[in-house]
Amino acid sequence: MVSAQQVEVRTKQNINVMKLNTLNSVMVLATTFADKGDWTVEQQFVLQMGSSYLLAHGIGTPLAKDAVTTVTVPCDGEYNVLVRTKNWTKHWSDGPTPGIFEVKIDGQSDGVTYGTDSVNWYWQKGGKVSLTAGEHTIALHDLTGFDGRCDAVILTTEDYTPSESLEEYFELREALLGTPVVEDKGSYDFVVVGGGISGICAALAASRLGLKVALIQDRYVLGGNNSSEVRVGLGGQINIDPYPSLGYLLNEIGPDRIGNARGAHHYQDDKKLNVVLAEKNISLFMGYTVIEVEKSGDAIASVVAQEATMQNRIKISGKYFSDCTGDAHLGYMAGAECRMGREARAEFNEPLAPEKADDMTMGVSIEWYCEDWNTPCTFPDSLDWGLRLDEYTVEPVHRANWYWEVGMMDDQVADAEKIRDYGMYVAYSTFSYCKNRYSKKEDWICTHLTWVSHVSGKRESRRIMGDYILREQDLTRPIHHEDETCTTTWRIDQHYPMEKNSKDYPNQEWLSYGVLTPIDFYALPYRCFYSKDISNMFMAGRNISVTHIALGSTRVMRTCGLIGEVVGMAAAVCARNNATPRDVYTTYFEDLKELMRKGTGRTDVPYTQFYHQVDRTGHQAEDR
């Protein structure tokens, strides 16, 4: 129910928005610039802040090439410049932010430095420019290479600055840019949302069993955490009893090299893409984020997805869906019961669970590395804005690894951009300290910060509840179930903030440690792979039906790939029998078992998945 006060506020906003129209204003989204220059399209946070945006990810070096576009101004006049941006370091520092840029109109700066004020996305009021009706150029000129960001620019003759309200932002967009046209892309047997390892495997398995499949991926690269954008290696074991044929599919797409934070080629993005493109039954939609769900009763009927440049929307209908988003975005929008955080010990009698439930999760790793070259280089000193480091708190390493982990105390969905930003903030601050103030800085004279990811490597967020919730004691006793499927092989691997790091940086920790609880190889119940609330939705990946503790084993990527393969098979069983995912458990499980015995992967390709199969290496292991 909407209150009278909310109606009053909304009415006032509508009146204000109406001041800006196509007769006195022009709006351009940064992601629609004709030439984006060296700026990066950033689409991770569409569901949080309403849009994709351009990011100046120069790793401390100002971008060489501006983003430039042409706009048509409606009339002669004095135009106010408004820019939707934010001060991304203000969460942790009141000093001058490094994430700044200029806006140039017809080659001339309007005299304002953008990205300096609010920690939230807001409309920063810029200068005034005299313009004649007709075409003019707008350019975004980065000043630092430290991740300044721009979502949109408005030129208006009205003296009005919009609020931070997302509702008002959407109204402005519609008033100045029109209502987006949604292109209907047809209906599919199986719609997979999320193109990480689990989503790829789900789509491939279903396709090879004859289903018409749509695979929707919000990035322009497949692979999720195992892509060149995030650079986390695969972990876990495949081809294990009771269904040893499960895993050959993952072998087809998995890189043949171990390691976190290595060169882009290490993660073999093309290998994944080429296997998917070879499947005639798969329609691949890259760069699309699902933003709306249409339901029919308790089933999903269709989804609407927004393309990353914000120019196109598509509608995809389906008979069955799988949430492989990691964050459970599809299930959450569809109304499925989700959990996030740690369950209380008493709820499931899990010995490793905390006494009281809380919101803590395992965190995000922002991978980065530096390299020693033969040429000296400098790097800006972050003293005025960076993390406060000294000889005792700095980690003078050349490469981040799994234990560089942020955001454990934050909301992994709502605070996703802040968490990502803090990971970059720590990386920049660490390298800057080593280059400029460290007692051994002479060892860093020729060290270059080569790569910092701007894409979050997530471990945990929402989990969708199924007909069964996997618990700690299922894994440790173990307790076997009649609906056994693929096998999890990783120990229960729980991460916590390092005590010293918590003391030095309370609620802003960035170093973690792992607690490993041994398990026998364990076959996961099928009932963890479909929603108890949405009658036609599966899930595969880290958002399956498990407790926080059990997730410590099931979340690693090879295991997620096995789950995806099983889910693709289950979708095929559903399609053949006009059944629901639950019906597969109650009526058609023998059909699924037959498919699992056969597998869907090829055995005539080189087998490369020998590395990092079972974690026996303790605290400083990779890929955790």
Language-model segments: residues:
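Bacterial Sec-dependent N-terminal signal peptides
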Residues: M1-Q6
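Extracytoplasmic
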Residues: V7-E183
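Short, solvent-exposed loop/turn and secondary-structure capping segments
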Residues: W92-G95, R149-A152, E164-E167, A203-A205, ...
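Flavin (FAD/FMN)-binding glycine-rich loop and adjacent Rossmann-like elements that form
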Residues: L177-D184, N225, G287, A299-S302, ...
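Beta1/beta-strand and adjacent pyrophosphate-binding region of the FAD-binding site
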Residues: D184-G196
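N-terminal Rossmann-fold NAD(P) dinucleotide-binding loop
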Residues: G199
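Conserved N-terminal/central alpha/beta ligand/cofactor-binding core
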Residues: A205, L211-K212, Q217-S296, R339, ...
